[in-house]
């Protein structure tokens, strides 16, 4: 049974201040939760229908499990079609390693305020094998539920950092790391041979 306290916590995770307070974020749906179970992230709890728990019980050792019915799931889900499972995971602490950034391709995001767009960018970055993503304070939160959903699991694999981009770019340019900009009339990234190291800078939507 889903308690009122847990229901309130899950509902509050829509807001950044509560995600920071509890150090948790929400993952909805069978596919994303399936990816979460195979990721290194620490799962705080799983809220699910009994049928889903029975089908997946072999993968659920050492996980705090809460059974829920349809009425209870309606109260905590953003989906129009109810998911069978919702997970709460701890927000990971990513360690910045300069030597790793200097030897790879990273993404720098300025003012990406729409969480859905940010999640899509994370997904594309993951597809290209980009592992480090730097955001400024004007970007949406990467653990916003809309961003998590749009990332389609990339959020479990890429490392994200919020930082002063001018300081970061200055420091890494001094180390000789090339910087690439994105433009509407530029070359198609899908048909362009990318460097194996450097910073790709993307600006805001507007």
Language-model-detected regions and their locations in the chain:
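Boundary-proximal intrinsically disordered activation/regulatory segments immediately upstream
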Residues: 1-54, 139-140
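Short active-site oxyanion
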Residues: 21-24, 42-45, 62-64, 132-133, ...
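RNA substrate-binding interface of SAM-dependent RNA methyltransferases
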Residues: 38, 98-189
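Generic beta-sheet signal
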Residues: 49, 68-69, 88, 136, ...
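Active-site regions of enzymes building and remodeling cell-envelope glycoconjugates
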Residues: 59-69, 104, 193-199
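Glycine/small-residue-rich loop that forms an oxyanion/phosphate-binding "nest" at active or ligand-binding sites
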Residues: 63-90
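Short, hinge-like loop/turn segments at secondary-structure boundaries
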Residues: 85, 150-154, 197-200
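Active-site/ligand-binding-proximal alpha/beta "capping" segment
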Residues: 181-206
């Amino acid at each position: 049974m889903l308690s009122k306290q847990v229901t309130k916590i899950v509902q509050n995770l829509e807001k950044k201040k509560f995600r920071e307070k509890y150090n948790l974020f929400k993952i909805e749906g069978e596919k994303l939760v399936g990816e979460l179970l195979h990721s290194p992230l620490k799962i705080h709890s799983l809220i699910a229908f009994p049928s889903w728990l029975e089908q997946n019980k072999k993968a659920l050792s050492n996980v705090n499990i809460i059974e829920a019915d349809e009425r209870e799931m309606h109260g905590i889900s953003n989906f129009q079609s109810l998911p069978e499972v919702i997970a709460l995971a701890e927000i990971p602490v990513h360690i910045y390693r300069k030597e790793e950034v200097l030897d790879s391709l990273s993404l720098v995001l300025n003012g990406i305020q729409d969480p859905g767009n940010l999640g899509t960018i994370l997904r594309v970055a993951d597809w290209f094998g980009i592992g480090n993503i730097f955001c400024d304070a004007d970007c949406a939160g990467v653990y916003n539920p809309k961003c998590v959903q749009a990332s389609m699991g990339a959020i479990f694999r890429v490392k994200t950092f919020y930082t002063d981009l001018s300081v970061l770019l200055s420091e890494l340019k001094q180390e000789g790391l090339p910087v690439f900009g994105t433009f509407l009339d530029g070359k198609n990234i899908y048909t362009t041979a990318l460097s194996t190291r450097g910073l790709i800078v993307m600006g805001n939507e507007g």
